Amino acid sequence: MHHTAERPRPLAGVLGVVAQVRGRGKTMPDFAIERQCQGLVCGIDEAGRGPLAGPVVAAAVILDSRRFPKMLRGELDDSKVLTREQREACYRALRRCADRGVARIGVGAASTVEIDRLNILRAALLAMARAVAVLGVRPDIALVDGAIAPPLACAVRTVVKGDALSFSIAAASVVAKVTRDRIMRGLAPRYPGYGWETNVGYATQEHGEAIRRLGITRHHRRSFAPMRLADVGDLPLFAALAAGPL
């Protein structure tokens, strides 16, 4: 049977759930959004849209809410508000959940070549689709962090700031972030001087100075504005851009 991908739209009822959550001062994610859905629910998020170097990585996570560990309920959150140590601890716990059948985890990525060819948004959506493809099961509905989602062979709903609201999306954000950071730290010894062991490819002053001094590697995103400026030799402007947040 041919399945037509449903056009992504905000999840019905999500705004009401969010209002209730905020109204009672709740700041941690939970399963409230998942409970509004029918069937097998998958959370999707990505990491690495902003860096100057490295892939964009996405994760798709399905959680069994009935067996989800109490420890993780108190610790799991949007990866951006967790420390590196907290992210790593949550990642290990999620992997243990997967080993016990409490979670299913799929990870996908798009390379720098694909980022330069497609643009970063399309590459991120491609990584999301790849993550879902390796889950091993097709979800009935995918909850995607943000306002834009890839076409999938299941119902798709976007949830703005979903990584702070939904356990499934928060789990995906942690898996994607930790996976990408590990990739960049693994590349760091092969490309000394760029500081990837700490900046993981993001635009920092150290990274910008290294690019001016050492040049661009095959892992840098040549389509990004600072890379184009470096190519044409506009180093003062490049340094200003690379030193600030992207």
Provide a role label for each language-model segment.
Residues 2-246:
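RNase H-like, Mg2+-dependent phosphodiesterase core
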